[in-house]
């Protein structure tokens, strides 16, 4: 819509859930990729994994910064934290060292696609900081493995 209105906009409570899940996912991916970068099992991808791990770790902080501090949203924060989806995503990375690059590529592709969908649900004015964060994350992931 050209008038700034968004169909099916994200509520503040939904935003809390979205940003917590994104922060936890980014943290978990960062940890996994950092481990891969230093375990010596696949020297050919260690630099790529280290770079991605550092960026994803930084993204986690950016997502946490998007979460409003309010006792009124404590239930949403608790409900979103530790969501079961994280286990399923990380299971996709349980692969032999030689398959790491090909395993991480679709996970990051899905993250990029998800951020595109989320950005369409955010208001260009009220959610401008979140949209900026999405743009920064997408720019950081442009050189991801494919």
Where do the model's predicted regions map?
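Acidic/His metal-coordination segments adjacent to aromatic residues that form catalytic metal sites
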Residues: 2-20, 79-107
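Generic structural signal for well-ordered, non-transmembrane alpha-helical segments
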Residues: 20, 24-27, 50, 54-61, ...
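Helix-loop segments that flank and shape redox-cofactor active sites
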Residues: 28-54, 114-130
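Internal, well-ordered domain-core segments that constitute the primary functional module
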Residues: 120-146
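Leu/Val/Ala/Ile-rich N-terminal alpha-helices, chiefly Sec-type signal peptides and the beginnings
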Residues: 2-44
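Short, highly charged low-complexity linear segments
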Residues: 85-96, 111-125
């Amino acid at each position: 819509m050209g008038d700034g209105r968004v169909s099916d906009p994200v509520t503040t409570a939904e935003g809390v859930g979205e940003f917590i899940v994104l922060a936890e996912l980014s943290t978990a991916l960062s940890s996994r990729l950092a481990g891969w970068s230093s375990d010596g099992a696949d020297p050919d991808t260690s630099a790529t994994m280290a770079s991605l791990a550092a960026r994803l770790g930084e993204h986690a902080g950016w997502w946490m910064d998007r979460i409003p501090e309010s006792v009124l949203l404590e239930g949403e924060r608790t409900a979103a934290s530790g969501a079961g989806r994280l286990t399923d995503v990380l299971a996709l990375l349980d692969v032999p060292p030689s398959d790491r690059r090909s395993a991480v590529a679709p996970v990051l592709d899905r993250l990029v696609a998800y951020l595109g969908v989320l950005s369409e649900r955010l208001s260009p004015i009220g959610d401008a900081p979140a949209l900026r964060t999405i743009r920064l994350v997408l720019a950081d992931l442009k050189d991801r493995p494919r």
